[in-house]
Amino acid sequence: MLSFARRFQTIAAPTGQRAINPENPMRLIKLPIAALILAFAQSPHAANAENKTPEADAGKALSAFFDAEWDYEMQQNPAQASSLGDRRWNDRWSDRSLEAIQKDEHHTTDALARFTKIDRTRLSAADQLNYDLFKKDLEMEIDGFKFRTYLMPISQRGGLQTLDELGDRLRFETVKDYEDWIARLRSLPALFEQEMTLMREGAKTHVMWPKIVLSRIPAQIDKQIVSKPEESPFFKPFKKFPDSIPNGDRERLTKSASEAIASGVLPSFQKLKRYFVEEYLPAAFDQVGVWQMPQGAEFYAYLARRHTTTTLTPQQIHEKGLSEVARIHAEMQAVMEKVGFKGTLPEFFTKLRTDPQFFYKTPEELLEAYRALAKRIDPNLVKVFKTLPRTPYGVTPIPDKIAPDTTTAYYSQPAADGSRAGVYFVNLYKPETRPKWEMMALSLHESVPGHHLQIALAQELGDIPKFRRYGGYTAFVEGWGLYAESLGQEMGLYDDPYSRFGQLTYEMWRAVRLVVDTGMHHMKWDRQRAIDFFMANAPKAENDIVNEIDRYISMPGQALAYKIGELKIKELRDRARAALGERFELREFHDAVLLSGAVPLDVLERNIDAWIATRKAASTSTPATAKP
């Protein structure tokens, strides 16, 4: 899972399609956004575009437009800009008023008409792709306006109660860095009022998450309500200053931060807690699917299209999931027999969940083991990859305050300016529920060759617009992550039957998602039925399974992307191998998949078909040796 769609649902959320606004987890930062288009449309470049300029001029105009758009989007989403290393708006939050949101929507709708006046035929092939992706994203965003997802800005995976985590993503090197953070602390009460206004409207119109997941939030808010300002998570940057900041400034900054927290931050959390417990939570649904929201069936079908980048219906996805579950069961059975277990598959699951030999005793041991796995994986990448990213990554624990309520692990992308490496966050809560046999598959997914390799490579691509370099499509990003787990076999990393079973467990986990996500949100399953199906088909710990099901409840449709994307990548790999025979080279195939950045699955298919045609046409004196 990804942090910029992942935990700006706890400040950078599980992978969604683009980055997610930390002040509103459900709003995907479209990076192609309306008012930016307006900014371009009002610029000199717009006239050239609308007058159908020659290819060179049209390309320059489009490039200038994308640059202007990126800047505007960052200005509208300051926390996102800060997370990417852009400090220009470090002293503020987004405007989350209803008026600002409605203005944005109006601009987006108006802007699409202006954007389509750009003559696509005058653009190069590469810019035509950029144009098409931008236009498709914009149309998808407009299609989603009717669902008013901005009215549910808080879930157990993030919202106001996790905004302090932005501080962990920032550099505090100068006096201004600290002053900017203090300015943000002082403006938090206004942000809380705006978000609570949205929540009130959501409760009134039944656009909110179900009670079962919202009930986790009061305990999270409680961790923000401390007796002294110095105990607040927002005070953390002031506990250690760089040597370059004089003592006098340190004292002044520390005093200002304490005053801002005492006078504004703590009262805001107290007010949020009262409203949440007394009014918001009681208004929530008891059932779990989005089918009960206004236009719920249409909303879920929209989310399925958005996250999978396909036209598959929820029913088709459900049936595909059942088929995959049956296939993977057969492979699990074979591994169980290989280790000599005498019993049924459910009994083997119980052994894997409970046998002490499969677990570390302490969080410290678990973290050390994750870091050792990373060191083992890295040198094996060259076996299956030709191009590797320059940006490093680290392995870090998930913050204690959210670990009980979140998933097994997630990834947070590097800063755009290179000031922060990628981070593979691992959950150390209850190590007795985190089996050794799952750790390799999990690490391959979240770090390398999964999310870190794919996202860091995309960020290092210099020839695509920023909205593509730092954005993504759930089906591509998470499909790649799941596909990366299977590469452990080519890399020689599944060197015992249990780690291989762990890989199958993780594949089964994603197949189960197709069934339970559509089950709850389309077929009206209750939560317990989803938990029971998961428990019966995958040996993950019950605590993990419950957290996963609750994640699907508050992130409808996102979990569909993993298996759908992985199946497409494997289909294209098989197609390429069949077409190229001895000329098929796995490392070059991976370049063909990754070096255009994240794209919708239909675009990926066109890219690979073009790569196959080019490879077939190329003359070579020495045929390549076929690789698996």
What do the predicted segments below correspond to?
Residues 5-11, 19-33:
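Bacterial N-terminal signal peptides that target proteins for export
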Residues 13, 28, 405-409:
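Long alpha-helical scaffolds
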Residues 30-43:
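Bacterial N-terminal signal peptides
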Residues 47-628:
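N-terminal maturation segment of proteins
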